[in-house]
Swiss-Prot record:
Belongs to the ribulose-phosphate 3-epimerase family. GO terms for molecular function: D-ribulose-phosphate 3-epimerase activity; metal ion binding. A divalent metal cation binds at H38, D40, H69, D175. Pfam families: Ribul_P_3_epim. Its EC number is 5.1.3.1. Keywords: Carbohydrate metabolism, Isomerase, Metal-binding. It catalyses: D-ribulose 5-phosphate = D-xylulose 5-phosphate. This is Ribulose-phosphate 3-epimerase. HAMAP family: RPE.
Length: 215
């Protein structure tokens, strides 16, 4: 029998509900102990577009806190939607489209709005190249799949960035391909574990066991 005790907070990625938002299912997840939603926003930085501010009010009504993950190029236009919404607790954005001065500008903007700020990294982007910036952050989002769509397989190349992230004093969120058969490989190294399709496919009793540490 799989060990379902995970001593890290689970964040449910909303991507599996992209084409059919299911409030009743989310209310069930909340009743089971889920408290954190991972909310992906995409533009042409990746080969997909998803949520653009939809459902935040409903998520707040249910009681969720929201981590917003911005996989975007047009950050100047997209960011304001999330800066002042009460449900949004943390905002991370990808470093790859931007130079260092631009990244610093957006970090300051997010901090000024009172949100926790993070930078997101593809597993092919060396974290060490952004060391000084990472030291200013509340958290980092480390991608363990190529960004842009759900249901992909976990890529162990993320361990390079994971090892580097431990040298800094910020929380670590890992995102992509996490399922019951690999969650224990990374749980001791991170603070937040993002699960999408791997979470929604669980039996309810499995979700409840997995979420015990959220309560």
């Amino acid at each position: 029998m799989l060990n379902l005790v995970v001593n890290r907070e689970i964040a449910f990625s909303l991507l599996p509900l992209l084409h059919q938002f299911d409030r009743k299912l989310l209310e069930q997840f909340f009743a089971d102990g889920l408290r954190l939603i991972h909310y992906d926003v995409m533009d042409h930085f990746v080969d997909n577009t998803v949520f653009q501010g939809e459902h935040l009010d409903e998520l707040q009504q249910i009681g969720f806190q929201v981590n917003v993950h911005l996989m975007v190029q047009a950050l100047e236009q997209i960011l304001p939607v999330y800066l002042h919404h009460q449900a949004v607790k943390r905002i991370s954005f990808h470093v790859e489209p931007f130079d260092i001065p631009t990244i610093k500008h957006f970090i300051a903007q997010i901090k000024q709005a009172g949100k926790q700020v993070g930078l997101a990294f593809k597993f092919t982007t060396p974290l060490v190249n952004y060391e000084r910036l990472v030291q200013q952050l509340d958290f980092v989002t480390l991608m363990s799949v190529p960004p842009g769509k759900g249901g992909q397989a976990f890529n162990s190349a993320v361990f390079n960035n994971l090892k580097q992230a431990h040298k800094y004093h910020c929380s670590i969120e890992i995102d992509g391909g996490i399922k019951l058969d690999n969650i224990h490989q990374i749980q001791d190294d991170v603070n937040f574990i993002v699960m999408g399709s791997g979470f929604i496919k669980l039996e309810r009793w499995q979700r409840q066991q997995l979420l015990k540490t959220n309560q």
